[in-house]
Amino acid sequence: MITHLKRGQQLLLRHLSTAPPPLPRPPPIADRRVVVTGLGAVTPFGHLQPTWEALLAGKTATRTSTQLASSDLALPTHVVASIPDSFDPAPYLTNARAQSVPFIALALAAATEALQDAGLITTNHDETQTVTENDNHHVLSVPERTGVAIGAGVGSLAEVTSSHTTLETRGLRRLTPYFVPRTLINLAAGHVSMKFNLRGPNHSCATACATGAHSVGDAYRFVRFGDADVMVAGGTESTIDPLSIAGFSRVKALSTGFNENPSVASRPFDKRRDGFVMGEGSGVLVLEEYEHAKRRGAKIYAEIRGYGLSGDAHHITAPASDGRGAIQAMKSALLQSGLSPNDVAYINAHATSTPMGDAIEARAIHQVFHTEVQGLASARESLLKVSSTKGATGHLLGAAGAVEAIFAVLALHHKVAPPTANLHDIDDDAPTELNFVPLEAQPLSNDARATMTNSFGFGGTNASLVFGQI
């Protein structure tokens, strides 16, 4: 017995002497401030800078898809908002066979841009390197404290359909072993994690069109409660393919009345709206604990002040007619932020250009911000600017919430509200206390304190984010 104990002690000591060093101890759980230090996106306008410039100029990116228009499937819409043909994913890929599926490639591109914008990496034609601080300490040299939260709503139905065709026509041995990794939604986050050696929380959610906002909100909580010091967070999507278009057409979600004039097909809050335009892209934000960001002298765009989420418990595709889920999400985000309705200068609405959804959201916003809501400070005293940038970009599904969170951050940072494109004739019963920013960008007050973004998805899933001036 004693011999066995001594041998066990020797094995334990040998293991301890060769074991890797312990992981860094996380800070005690507390409410830590979380700021936005990097932004990256790929949209139907291109990367982030040309996208923002196009938004403010009132341009639209919706156009005719020659693939859909020439298809013999008799699809009811040919209008999409696709990534520019000039976009080249190759520089962002480290394993083209595994990463070339568009929703993964777009996430890698947006994450690279966001990390570079945050000053955490430098890039050249051949490699990506971490940036060093003045004391030669790598900002990302504690990879366990930096994580990823990137989701997608659908992923790649095109990969599924093409692989099924390969299996049926050419047999099992011709099916690529990359099929499953190309279609798993969490592999967008996985590839970003692997490319940049980020070993903190590796998280991916799939909440339909609220995915991007939920990913940012979840990442905010990871930083706030000490699971990470830095999070790379957002959403990605690429579903412009015949099966996706057919599927969304069957639930009567897509615009079908503007095939001859595609640039005006997406028209949130407008009387002639008849459905959304399928878009694609990716948006990524770098979220960082405030003191961590200050220590390294990071540029800070805004602070995340609130994150509200809810469920309608109503219908698989339609929102509750009383807007209860949207109201609860917005109210929760506001209460968490500690701000009053008067502090919010601009809302980037989810409004996708559907007849029902836009009207319900407008009434919900009005109820939260212009009527007395239990638990909130007094109602607003002035018009609230509310716009939907989907009139310009189309609907990016799982990427929409992240891209539009970026727009809300930039609206606060630059003190300007991007317009609602194609909004010529507002609903007669639209709340008159809301300024829907039709056609042209409008300035925000220099003392604007906060902005909000809403994202809602099939199944009644809702998310609202509040960004505050730092």
Stretch-by-stretch model annotation:
Residues 212:
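Short conserved active-site loop signatures built around small residues
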Residues 44, 154, 208, 352-354, ...:
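Glycine-rich phosphate/pyrophosphate-binding beta-alpha loops
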Residues 8, 12-96, 118, 291-303, ...:
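ACP-dependent fatty acid/polyketide chain-elongation machinery
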Residues 33-37, 63, 261-337, 345-346:
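Condensing-enzyme catalytic core mediating Claisen C-C bond formation in acyl metabolism
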Residues 20-31, 118-151, 164-177, 194-202, ...:
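Structural signature of cysteine-dependent C-C bond-forming condensing enzymes
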